[in-house]
Amino acid sequence: MSGNSSTDMYLFKKSLKELKGKKGKGTELISVYVPAGRRLSDISQYLRQELSQSSNIKSKTTMKNVQSAIEVILQRLKLLKEPLEMGVIIFAGMIPRGGPGTEKMEVYVLEPPEPVKTFVYRCDSLFYTDPLEDFIQDTEVYGVILVDRNEATIGTVKGKTITVLKKLTSGVPGKFKAGGQSARRLERLIDDAAHQFMVRIGEYATESFMPILEEKKLKGLLLGGPGNTKNEFAEKDYLHHELKKKIIDTFDLCYTEEFGIRELLDKASDLLRDLDLMKEKNLIQRFFKELIKDDGGLSAYGEAQVMKYLEMGAIDTLIVTEDIGITRVTIKCNNCDYTQEVNVKTNEMFKFEEQLKTKACPTCGGAMYIDEEKDIIEHLSDLCNVHNTDIIVVSTDTEEGSQISRAFKGMAAILRYKL
C-alpha cells in the first residue's frame, strides 16, 4: 500500500465496489483469504489439492476455468514475500465481457488495511467479498448526547459520518412564576416530568451506546446543550455507570438537533483532532484561508494547475475528493517508442477507446493502443511519494469536501512556497 491511510482506504473501497460487480458464467470464481503470518507453502499445498479435486467437475468449460484460476493464484503466491504482516486476499476467475467466448481471466491481489484473521477458500459465481466489508468500517465511534429541558438528540460520529439515532421531546412546560400552593405543586410536577425525561434519555443512550461499548469501539461520549440541563444529566445517575465513565466533556451549545452536533464538533475540535472529520475540515479551511488572500496565497486548484505544481515538487499538501472520477491512461504506438499519458473522465473511457482506434501516432503514423489504466488518485499518490507531498482523499459527504468537488472539480492544494 501507499502508506497514506486515506488513499489506501479509497483504493480499497474502489476495489471492493469493482469486485462486487463481477459475475462468472458458472461457479468458477475463486476467492482466497490468507491470514496474517500464515505460511504460504501451506496455502499453496491446499490449493494444489483443490486443483486435483477440480478434475471431477462435470462441465469441461467450468473445470478448465476453475483450474486456470487456481493456477494463476498459485503463480501470484510465488511472487509474495513472507512474512505477510496483514495477510493477503486474492481473487481470480474468467469474467465475461459480453456473449459466449468473451471471457477473460481477471486477477486481483489486495493487501487489506487490517490483518486477515481466517483462511478462506471459496469457489462461486461471485467473488466472496463479505469479509472486506468489515475492513472498511471505521472502528472508533464517539457517542453524542445533546439535551435541554425540552428536547434531546442522541447520535454518533464515526469517521466522517454523523448519524442521528434518536430525537426526543419532553413535553415539559416552562417554570410557573405565580405563587401559592398550586404553583408549588405544579412546579413539583414539572420537575418530576423533567426527571422522567432524563430517565428516558438515559435509557435510549444505554440502548444505543452499550452495544458499541461492548464491541470496544466507543471512544467516548460528548454531552452538550444550552443551559445547565446537560450538567445535571452528566452528574446524576441517568446514564449507565459504564457509559458515565466514557464522558469526555460537556459543551455549551445553542442547538440540540443535528446542527447542534456540528456545533459541538467545532467546539470539541481540540479533543477530536485525530477524527477524520476534523482533519478534513481543518485542512480544507487552511486551503480556503490561503485562497482568499489578495495574491491567492499558497493555494492551487484545478487539474492542470495542480498536476503542474505537483510534478515540480511545489505542493505541500494535496486535497482530492473521492468522486473525482478520472483515469490516468498511458497510450503507446504499435510501431515506435512513442508514449503519452492523458487524464480521461472515467465515465468517458469507452468514448476515448473508440476515438483512439482512429488516432495515428504523431511520430510515425502507426496505430495507438492503451498500455495502462490507473485511477488518478493512485497516480497522484505515487507522485506525492516521489515529492514527499502529503495527500488526503476527502469525502463529499461533508460540506467542505462538497465545496472542493463543486468549485475546484475535486482537486486543490496547499503549496510549499509562493509561485
UniProtKB/Swiss-Prot annotation:
The keyword Cytoplasm appears for this protein: yes
GO cellular component entries: cytoplasm
Record-given protein name: Peptide chain release factor subunit 1
HAMAP family (alphabetical): Rel_fact_arch_1
Gene name for this UniProt entry: prf1
Subcellular location: Cytoplasm
NCBIfam families hit by this protein: aRF1_eRF1
Function according to Swiss-Prot or TrEMBL: Directs the termination of nascent peptide synthesis (translation) in response to the termination codons UAA, UAG and UGA.
Source organism, top-level taxon: Archaea
